[in-house]
Regions:
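HhH-family (HhH-GPD) DNA N-glycosylase catalytic core used in base-excision repair
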Residues: 2-5, 12-221
């Protein structure tokens, strides 16, 4: 769900034009991928460059918390199309800046057609920024905190069909419960598991997906 580099083939370790690191050795756009949830160019590029690659940057963690919460009840494709608008509206996903949003900012966001104009989701993003800062203060970084739910190491699964993928796990249940206890909103277990998939806490690429081995190697580093 992100922008890609200009070359037709991504390097083994590179950076997209949005600044996001990715790991890939396959064409940046494929007509088909075994991970069949990626059905259009934007989703396939996201799948090929980001999905499942371990995240260790707090701004990116806040981005995924914000976007996954916004996606509740909607399709991920919808959020992908709005991602750039979210990046602008939410100050490059800087939690320190978002935490300072007030009534004027809420009014601005409700008028922004580029994002999901839902008051509950907007207010939750602001509240989540404040909770995020509290976690950073307690643990040093959100990254150090959140990876504890998988003991600091990605879980590498071996799914052969999409129907095998779980919607939630014991780990996502634990994450959801603790995040809610810390004041986060729109962080149910299903949302938490989707975030774990996206940020590489689990590798849920199918074993016959060209990205499976590359993401597994990244997870072992």
């Amino acid at each position: 769900m992100r922008k890609r580099g200009a070359d037709g083939i991504n390097s083994v370790l590179g950076r997209s034009d949005s600044g996001t690191k990715f790991i890939s050795s396959i064409p940046r756009y494929q007509e088909k991928t075994p991970c069949a949830w990626a059905r259009n160019e934007l989703a396939i590029r996201y799948h090929d460059e980001e999905w499942g690659v371990p995240v260790h940057d707090d701004h990116r963690w806040f981005e995924f918390i914000t976007l996954e919460g916004a996606q509740a009840g909607l399709s991920w494709d919808t959020i992908l199309r709005k991602r750039d608008a979210y990046r602008t509206a939410f100050k490059q996903f800087d939690p320190a800046r978002v935490a300072k949003f007030g009534d004027r900012d809420v009014t601005r966001l409700l008028a922004d057609a580029g994002i999901v104009r839902n008051r509950l989701k907007i207010n939750s993003a602001i509240g989540n920024a404040k909770a995020f800062l509290a976690v950073q203060k307690e643990f040093g970084s959100f990254d150090d905190y959140v990876w504890r739910f998988v003991d600091g190491k990605p879980r590498i699964n071996k799914w052969r069909a999409l129907k095998q993928l779980p919607a939630r796990t014991i780990e996502s249940d634990a994450m959801s419960k603790e995040l809610i206890g810390r004041g986060f909103k729109f962080v149910g277990s299903t949302i938490c598991y989707a975030m774990m998939q996206a940020t590489g806490m689990v590798n849920d690429h199918l074993v016959n997906c060209p990205r499976y081995k590359a993401v597994s190697r990244a997870a072992r580093k």
